[in-house]
Amino acid sequence: NHNPVPIIKPEDYELNFFINTKFINKFTLEDLKKMKSKKVITTIQCGGNRRGEFDKTSGTQWGIGAISTAEWEGIPLCNLLENYNAKYIHFEGYDGVKSSIPFKKGRNCFGDVLVAYKMNGVELPRDHGYPVRVIVPGYVGIRNIKWIQEIILEDEEIDSSWQKGIAYKILPGSIRCLEDVSKINLDDIDTINELP
């Protein structure tokens, strides 16, 4: 987790849905549980997994422990997006963490993106996003926002350090130290989304 784990009572939970700044809808936990659900087994991996095995990297020096596989259950995000269009889907958690994915990933029902409320057949543990989180199979862990509070459709990537910061960019091999980063425009560098 990037920030402290929020304490959210299930009866107080709300997921707000916006297009740009226009409010579209609000879902309670009970609303979500009444919708048709789907189960997906996927592996989530932190973008920094095994970072400690590289030379001179910043950030937590992870070994191989920032990865796990689980069965998730929730609402296919594509079902919530049926009548909409955009370039990006922004996610914001109750903990303040913000990230985005391309709209085509979330809108594709074969992409298995979920608004999930169960993990391995039981309600989500608090550390894994209770009561609701986003699951984006095949994407770096930071795109799988926990404690999801808002889904916003936009035409630009979200402007957050977890999306546009150097930790989540595919930097060219010529970048050997932090001072070298000032020589490039980070907006021209691809954001890490998919993992092998």
Q: Where do the model's predicted regions map?
A:
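A glycine-rich, hydrophobic loop/mini-helix early in the fold
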Residues: I8-K9, E14-W62
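Extended, aromatic/histidine-rich regions of cofactor-dependent oxidoreductases associated
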Residues: N1-N16, N20-F27, S37, E82-P196
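Short alpha-helical interface elements
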Residues: T57, E71, L77, D159, ...
